[in-house]
Amino acid sequence: MKILYTGANGLLGQKISAATPEYSNHAFLATARGLNRTKNLGTAAYASMDITDRLQIKSVLSKFRPDVIIHGAAMTHVDECELHKELAYQLNVIGTQNMVDAAREIDAHVVHISTDFI
């Protein structure tokens, strides 16, 4: 199975990366905006991907063709979301919609993970 996960530089993404060696029969692609800042990618490959950029998402997904997408990328700090409402909307709403739309095009299953604060 091929598994792509977003938010690789965040807490959840780092935990997934660390766990990938336990699932060596699966291929993993870790994604986040910009450079990889995760110290331990485990067995995952890394691709820079901005979830607000539909074309970039399509490009990454068409190359990797994941069966499952674990979507954990988000703006998670409540105070920052309040201060930067438009950015929070772009990342947490539009970015999520972009991921779902792109997943639908390649028939990938989406697991969306969030918090009760967002």
Predicted regions and their residues:
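Residues at the starts of beta-strands that form the adenosine-phosphate
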Residues: K2, A27-F28, H109
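Rossmann-fold cofactor-recognition segment
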Residues: L41-R54
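Helix C-cap/helix->beta junction micro-motif
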Residues: S24, F64, E105-I106
